[in-house]
């Protein structure tokens, strides 16, 4: 987990974080600072290693231009070195929402869990003290603990507005906008009761987006769902600056989706 979180950490950051309160979280970032003679294989600096090997072979007369093989030995090995830096940041909360309705098959639910799991792992490894809340929904929404969020397998109809209402109420009760950086991430296959789309978009546009630093919606492809909710968001709210949309066709697309949701420069 730590290794993948470190890899992600080179390309991601919590978007639009702002100083809002005296209660700080700690941001930890890794920065490559130089080259060392020792280190793990995952950080081997191949260019520097082969340069050292070439220089050694030339100086000892073992380099043959007609047979230019460069064979590094232990003393040639060079590794990237890094330094962890910590800086105070303002407090933040991430609210995860996951569709567990019947149109979400086992594969779709697994893709959503994998993606949200790694986002969660990365956030915790880089933002010490960040708060997290978890919502699952089918036709109704409820708050659950982290373990239930990543393990529950429910079914039923879909009413996305139930999750957005609960998220809105959670923010109003516990997270004053003036004091918190608030992020909401919703994972679904985009299937929703037709009459509910209008209510969803109203809650999202009028209540959630004004309170959120960022709203991320990741839609997984499903053979059972209509998948139309992504298009509804694009047409009504796609121009809003604090909304990010991602499609996840399969497991191979998970990393790209994470980069879309939390990539630098947002």
Q: Which residues does each PLM region occupy?
A:
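Acidic/polar low-complexity segments with low predicted structural confidence
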Residues: 1-90
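Acidic, glycine-rich A-domain
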Residues: 44, 49, 73-74, 81-95, ...
